[in-house]
Amino acid sequence: MAYYALVGTAGIRRSRTPRLGRPVGISPSVTAVGGVVLLLPDGEAVSGRGPSARAHAAALSLGRRLARAGHTEGLVAHVVHYRGRGWNGADAQPAADASWAVTEAVRRYGDVPICLVGHGMGARAALRAAEDPAVDAVLALAPWLPDQDVAAEPEPVRHLLGRRVLIVHGTNDARTDPELSYRLAERAKKSNRDVCRFEVHSDGHALRQYRDEVHALAADFVLGSLFARPYARPVADALAAPPPLGLRMPLAAGFGSAPGR
């Protein structure tokens, strides 16, 4: 049932129902789904507008890359359509929509491994929704995180125990502070050794400058986490290394271009 809600200064809007986009990766040769990637697009801190078409397109591009890479294992990807693009403080609607998407994926596909892949605000939603026991891995690209405030509760990380977690952040990101994602990774690593973080030097929030390398890194992590494919050496090293080495791993130009990677 639709209802009305007041969001900040954006005025009154009609809420939407979250949904999964069309599956990416399904073909006649795939007889069974072996794993699911749920892609969570970027958004805005405060907004009453609907989901961003541009952010959806960026997530869809990565979803296609991941589905192609995991075709033999029956990997399918869905881009999650939020009810709106705003986080809107304690409302945190995208995180709730991400949690709904996990439940929906389990309903559709049963007990298969699930990876949440988010960018910006979607990365924060992915990290939050990883509390669902059905989630096996989280890939957070340029996560939008709140500034640390002694008066506020820090972003939760304990629920990430038992999940593989990869954070990727451009060092020149002017929209989301890379140091905040480092601090979150540092806290998460204290209780979960399966956390690593890569820095994309000189790249910005959209991670366009090294898009091919970022997509290759994403595919390596997702397939290694969901289907036990061997990780590329840099990913394995980052997971094994203690802080700060494993949390400030540089993403090398040309990552993924070697044969077989």
Place the predicted regions along the sequence by residue.
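Short, surface-exposed "cap/lid" segments of acyl-processing enzymes
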Residues: 4-72
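Alpha/beta-hydrolase active-site loop
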Residues: 88-108
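C-terminal catalytic histidine-bearing segment of alpha/beta-hydrolase fold enzymes
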Residues: 182, 193-261
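Short alpha-helix in the alpha/beta-hydrolase fold that links the catalytic acid
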Residues: 153, 177-187
